[in-house]
From Swiss-Prot:
PROSITE patterns the record matches: RIBOSOMAL_S19E
Gene Ontology BP terms: translation
GO cellular component, one term: cytosolic ribosome
Organism domain of life: Eukaryota
Species whose genome carries this gene: Arabidopsis thaliana
GO molecular function: mRNA binding; structural constituent of ribosome
Pfam families (UniProt xref): Ribosomal_S19e
Protein name: Small ribosomal subunit protein eS19z
The family this protein is said to belong to: Belongs to the eukaryotic ribosomal protein eS19 family.
Amino acid sequence: MATGKTVKDVSPHDFVKAYASHLKRSGKIELPTWTDIVKTGKLKELAPYDPDWYYIRAASMARKVYLRGGLGVGAFRRIYGGSKRNGSRPPHFCKSSGGIARHILQQLETMNIVELDTKGGRRITSSGQRDLDQVAGRIAVEP
């Protein structure tokens, strides 16, 4: 008996690429004017090279909310944070930008993919879960 594939059944890298292209094709996400000049955190020295980085981050965040609900802006700042290089001084962990995470979560809310959770953070909606599972079903699984 063949069952439908979910987000958990496919490779994370393949899913994020496929869902990012789906978000770009749908045209429901409005790119802010600052996407080409903003850094993704104070730990970064330059803005992202990939012009579609905003769609990739949105797809990754939607996948993370799908797999583990209750994630808010602070959790995403920790997830996408990293090591800040301080020159000759030792490196330390630094959080990523909260404005980017907040803006993407608000965009996903307007698309009805995520919603506010009463316990805090965001959770996936039923239509969002169906949308993500449809994209996952289109991805071919390598044996």
